[in-house]
Curated annotation (Swiss-Prot):
InterPro entries: Marvel. The keyword Ribosomal protein does not apply. Keywords: Cell membrane, Glycoprotein, Membrane, Transmembrane, Transmembrane helix. Pfam families: MARVEL. Glycans are attached at N96. Residues 1-11, 65-69, 145-162 are cytoplasmic. One of its GO terms (cellular component) is plasma membrane. The keyword Transmembrane helix applies. This is CASP-like protein 0U1. It is found in: Cell membrane.
Length: 162
Protein backbone atom coordinates (compact mmCIF):
# COMPACT_ATOMS: atom_id res chain seq x y z
CA UNK A 1 0.00 0.00 0.00
CA UNK A 2 2.87 2.38 0.80
CA UNK A 3 4.34 1.86 -2.66
CA UNK A 4 1.07 2.94 -4.30
CA UNK A 5 0.96 6.09 -2.20
CA UNK A 6 4.61 6.84 -3.00
CA UNK A 7 4.03 6.48 -6.73
CA UNK A 8 1.31 9.15 -6.65
CA UNK A 9 3.58 11.97 -5.51
CA UNK A 10 5.11 14.51 -7.90
CA UNK A 11 8.53 13.72 -6.42
CA UNK A 12 8.25 10.06 -7.38
CA UNK A 13 7.03 10.92 -10.88
CA UNK A 14 10.07 13.18 -11.29
CA UNK A 15 12.28 10.28 -10.20
CA UNK A 16 10.68 8.01 -12.80
CA UNK A 17 11.33 10.59 -15.53
CA UNK A 18 14.96 10.95 -14.38
CA UNK A 19 15.34 7.17 -14.40
CA UNK A 20 14.01 6.92 -17.97
CA UNK A 21 16.22 9.78 -19.23
CA UNK A 22 19.33 8.22 -17.65
CA UNK A 23 18.40 4.86 -19.18
CA UNK A 24 17.99 6.33 -22.66
CA UNK A 25 21.20 8.37 -22.41
CA UNK A 26 23.40 5.41 -21.52
CA UNK A 27 21.57 2.91 -23.71
CA UNK A 28 22.15 4.84 -26.93
CA UNK A 29 25.84 5.25 -26.06
CA UNK A 30 26.42 1.63 -25.04
CA UNK A 31 27.96 0.48 -28.30
CA UNK A 32 30.64 3.19 -28.11
CA UNK A 33 32.16 1.71 -24.95
CA UNK A 34 34.89 -0.21 -26.76
CA UNK A 35 35.56 2.27 -29.56
CA UNK A 36 39.02 3.75 -28.98
CA UNK A 37 38.30 6.82 -31.11
CA UNK A 38 35.37 7.76 -28.91
CA UNK A 39 36.64 6.92 -25.44
CA UNK A 40 35.39 10.23 -24.04
CA UNK A 41 31.83 8.97 -24.52
CA UNK A 42 32.51 6.42 -21.77
CA UNK A 43 32.23 9.17 -19.15
CA UNK A 44 28.68 10.00 -20.23
CA UNK A 45 27.78 6.31 -20.20
CA UNK A 46 29.29 5.73 -16.75
CA UNK A 47 27.66 8.78 -15.16
CA UNK A 48 24.24 7.94 -16.63
CA UNK A 49 24.49 4.34 -15.41
CA UNK A 50 25.38 5.64 -11.94
CA UNK A 51 22.46 8.09 -11.96
CA UNK A 52 20.14 5.33 -13.19
CA UNK A 53 21.17 3.03 -10.33
CA UNK A 54 20.99 5.71 -7.62
CA UNK A 55 17.57 6.91 -8.76
CA UNK A 56 16.29 3.33 -8.89
CA UNK A 57 17.57 2.65 -5.36
CA UNK A 58 16.00 5.87 -4.10
CA UNK A 59 12.65 4.93 -5.66
CA UNK A 60 12.80 1.63 -3.77
CA UNK A 61 13.60 3.50 -0.56
CA UNK A 62 10.60 5.79 -1.10
CA UNK A 63 8.35 2.80 -1.81
CA UNK A 64 9.45 1.26 1.50
CA UNK A 65 8.17 4.32 3.34
CA UNK A 66 11.50 6.00 3.99
CA UNK A 67 13.12 9.16 2.65
CA UNK A 68 16.49 10.84 2.92
CA UNK A 69 16.75 14.08 4.88
CA UNK A 70 15.94 16.91 2.45
CA UNK A 71 19.35 18.58 2.65
CA UNK A 72 21.19 15.33 1.93
CA UNK A 73 18.79 14.58 -0.92
CA UNK A 74 19.38 18.06 -2.37
CA UNK A 75 23.17 17.68 -2.11
CA UNK A 76 23.16 14.26 -3.80
CA UNK A 77 20.99 15.40 -6.69
CA UNK A 78 23.00 18.62 -7.09
CA UNK A 79 26.22 16.59 -7.28
CA UNK A 80 24.72 14.34 -9.94
CA UNK A 81 23.35 17.34 -11.84
CA UNK A 82 26.87 18.79 -11.99
CA UNK A 83 28.39 15.46 -13.06
CA UNK A 84 25.77 14.96 -15.77
CA UNK A 85 26.28 18.51 -17.03
CA UNK A 86 30.04 17.87 -17.26
CA UNK A 87 29.31 14.64 -19.16
CA UNK A 88 27.08 16.61 -21.53
CA UNK A 89 29.84 19.15 -22.13
CA UNK A 90 32.46 16.45 -22.73
CA UNK A 91 30.20 14.71 -25.24
CA UNK A 92 29.27 17.95 -27.01
CA UNK A 93 32.91 19.01 -27.31
CA UNK A 94 33.95 15.58 -28.58
CA UNK A 95 31.18 15.63 -31.19
CA UNK A 96 32.33 19.02 -32.47
CA UNK A 97 36.00 18.00 -32.74
CA UNK A 98 37.39 17.11 -36.13
CA UNK A 99 38.99 13.78 -36.89
CA UNK A 100 41.06 12.70 -39.86
CA UNK A 101 40.23 9.37 -41.43
CA UNK A 102 41.69 7.56 -44.42
CA UNK A 103 39.24 5.94 -46.83
CA UNK A 104 40.58 4.22 -49.96
CA UNK A 105 43.84 6.15 -49.77
CA UNK A 106 42.14 9.54 -49.37
CA UNK A 107 42.49 11.58 -46.20
CA UNK A 108 39.19 13.05 -45.08
CA UNK A 109 38.63 15.49 -42.23
CA UNK A 110 35.19 15.40 -40.63
CA UNK A 111 33.42 15.99 -37.33
CA UNK A 112 33.53 13.04 -34.93
CA UNK A 113 29.73 12.68 -34.77
CA UNK A 114 29.04 13.50 -38.41
CA UNK A 115 26.38 11.12 -39.69
CA UNK A 116 25.80 9.60 -36.24
CA UNK A 117 22.72 10.46 -34.23
CA UNK A 118 23.41 8.41 -31.08
CA UNK A 119 25.95 10.75 -29.43
CA UNK A 120 23.80 13.77 -30.22
CA UNK A 121 20.71 12.11 -28.75
CA UNK A 122 22.63 11.00 -25.67
CA UNK A 123 23.97 14.53 -25.18
CA UNK A 124 20.45 15.94 -25.46
CA UNK A 125 19.07 13.45 -22.94
CA UNK A 126 22.03 14.14 -20.63
CA UNK A 127 21.33 17.88 -20.79
CA UNK A 128 17.66 17.32 -19.94
CA UNK A 129 18.62 14.83 -17.22
CA UNK A 130 20.89 17.46 -15.70
CA UNK A 131 18.00 19.92 -15.61
CA UNK A 132 15.74 17.32 -13.98
CA UNK A 133 18.38 16.49 -11.37
CA UNK A 134 18.83 20.20 -10.64
CA UNK A 135 15.05 20.39 -10.20
CA UNK A 136 15.19 17.51 -7.73
CA UNK A 137 17.87 19.37 -5.83
CA UNK A 138 15.67 22.47 -5.71
CA UNK A 139 12.77 20.38 -4.37
CA UNK A 140 15.05 19.08 -1.62
CA UNK A 141 16.09 22.64 -0.74
CA UNK A 142 12.45 23.76 -0.63
CA UNK A 143 11.60 20.89 1.70
CA UNK A 144 14.57 21.82 3.91
CA UNK A 145 13.67 25.53 4.03
CA UNK A 146 10.03 24.86 4.96
CA UNK A 147 10.01 22.04 7.51
CA UNK A 148 6.38 22.74 8.40
CA UNK A 149 5.26 22.22 4.79
CA UNK A 150 4.34 18.74 3.58
CA UNK A 151 7.52 16.91 2.63
CA UNK A 152 8.05 16.84 -1.13
CA UNK A 153 10.20 13.74 -1.07
CA UNK A 154 7.96 11.73 1.22
CA UNK A 155 4.51 10.36 0.63
CA UNK A 156 3.36 10.35 4.24
CA UNK A 157 0.57 12.68 5.21
CA UNK A 158 2.00 15.10 7.82
CA UNK A 159 -1.41 15.58 9.48
CA UNK A 160 -2.04 11.89 10.08
CA UNK A 161 -0.91 10.25 13.28
CA UNK A 162 1.74 7.57 13.04
Amino acid sequence: MAAVEAAKTPRFILLIIEWVFALVAFAVMGHYLFDDRRSSFEYLTAICILVWLVVMIYMVILCCGRALPPLIEAAIFLLFAILVFIAFLVTAVKCNNSETIVIAGQTISRKVCEGESEPKAAAAFAFLLGLLLAGSSVLGCIAFRRPSAPPLSSFQNPTSSV
